[in-house]
């Protein structure tokens, strides 16, 4: 099997020594080419090169942003059923998609999962993706406060300062008090009637929405990568209601509910129009401001190599 390993050497948890260790292990089972990214957007270019070159597997070692670039590269190559499988070795600070796919947080253990899947010839999992305008996403996208938090964190990262889950929480708290508490968004679900009076929109392709350290934050517990998108939208930013919903998101088995919350776990599309330009983030990357966006579920879009189920392991 021909494979390319795409590595972001600047991701939070990647090192040269670890890259070489993981590549050596993978090379025992596949014909491996290792390529490192050098700039933003390079991972997508490398993914296109891998598809055109006939790779059957692309292994990504990096954070969520690198994974997103690779997925968009695969999709832009328009290879259809001949597109390579994707496997993810966590290398970032949060690694939402990798964890949602059942991969170990430790990249060495995740490599063992991939090798085991290759040895037993485990079929890949075919999953849906989300798409906003012309950009695909693997785990979430959003308009509003979460996008502004992402921008603030990216600005800090650009200065060379460290980032953390606690930093995200502080920025979210700050952004809440800075934001205009007048609703700016109108949404339409599955091309239905418009619903005005919305402050923010989170759209998920998997559960959980993200993680706070080891704890999953679950906006849409019923959303899976095998079905449609999860919608989470707030029609009120009053502090008591926001705190109540925030507490629900941190509970492992809670289903968020509130008078000011619009939520659905399986929708085909969400169209959003904005009274004023609003920030957009996709898989943790800030894409600038938009005066509207359309989120669509793209079924059966990507084949992902995941850990071996117990039933296969025992055969």
Annotated model-derived regions:
Residues 189-190, 218-226, 233-315:
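ATP/nucleoside-binding phosphotransfer catalytic cores, i.e., glycine-rich phosphate-binding loops
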Residues 1-61, 68, 310-315:
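ATP/NTP phosphate-donor binding region
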Residues 146-149, 195-197, 208-213, 239-243:
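Short acidic/glycine-rich loop or secondary-structure boundary segments that cap or lie
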Residues 142, 146, 202-220, 286:
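Glycine-rich phosphate/pyrophosphate-binding beta-alpha loops
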Residues 155-167, 208-238:
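Gly/Ser/Thr-rich active-site loops/lids in small-molecule metabolic enzymes
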Residues 6, 16, 37, 75-200:
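Catalytic core of DAGKc-family lipid kinases
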Residues 2, 135-136, 184, 200, ...:
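Structural motif
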